[in-house]
UniProtKB/Swiss-Prot annotation:
Reactions catalysed: guanosine(527) in 16S rRNA + S-adenosyl-L-methionine = N(7)-methylguanosine(527) in 16S rRNA + S-adenosyl-L-homocysteine
rRNA processing recorded as keyword: yes
Enzyme Commission number(s) from the entry: 2.1.1.170
Any one GO molecular-function label of the UniProt entry: rRNA (guanine-N7-)-methyltransferase activity
Primary residence: cytoplasm
Subcellular location: Cytoplasm
Binding site for S-adenosyl-L-methionine: 83, 88, 134-135, 149
GO CC annotation terms, alphabetical: cytosol
NCBIfam families from the UniProt entry: rsmG_gidB
Record key words, sorted: Cytoplasm, Methyltransferase, rRNA processing, S-adenosyl-L-methionine, Transferase
Organism: Pseudomonas entomophila (strain L48)
The protein's name in its UniProt record: Ribosomal RNA small subunit methyltransferase G
Amino acid sequence: MSSLVTPQHAEELSTGARQLGVELSAQQHELLLGYLALLIKWNKAYNLTAVRDPDEMVSRHLLDSLSVMPFIHNDTQRWLDVGSGGGMPGIPLAILHPHKQVTVLDSNGKKTRFLTQVKMELKLDNLTVIHSRVEEVQPEQPFCGIISRAFSSMENFTNWTRHLGDSRTQWLAMKGLHPADELVALPADFTVESEQALTVPGCQGQRHLLILRRKA
């Protein structure tokens, strides 16, 4: 274990994952802590996250990302994390689902350099890092799932990514407060499939997950 990661961090991750109903193997637990160590190390120079205190990163980043894992369907193979920033939730998604192909996308070169370093150091062969604006990405085939965490408004999230999915794609928007005002401006060809209020161990404030579909 890296000197940047404490036994308390390890225990908080184990306990929190159990409370979320997410089963972690020993290898997944180790990889998540390895990711945390890299996040702590690189954040000092690269400003990857506004969370400066490493003791807050387990709950506000790792567990917050794990909270949506029960809603990731097993039969969805290709996922895109839009505006991934420091890698949430894309890196935890790739760690927990090694047989899924996960792409993390960000327009900030410092952040994609960090994500590339995480891919190399943790040997995440199922992870692809793209440095680009989302509007300029042209995938060979539609993604099965497109997810964002505090990326933009619901209107922008759906409009900017509509070309990356189809009627079979799930769009997952991770939000704090319920975005009722944003849903009013949702494009007409998108519908809300479900809304989930999430409780993240160690996190104050509201958390919501909205799952969307696009009409054919």
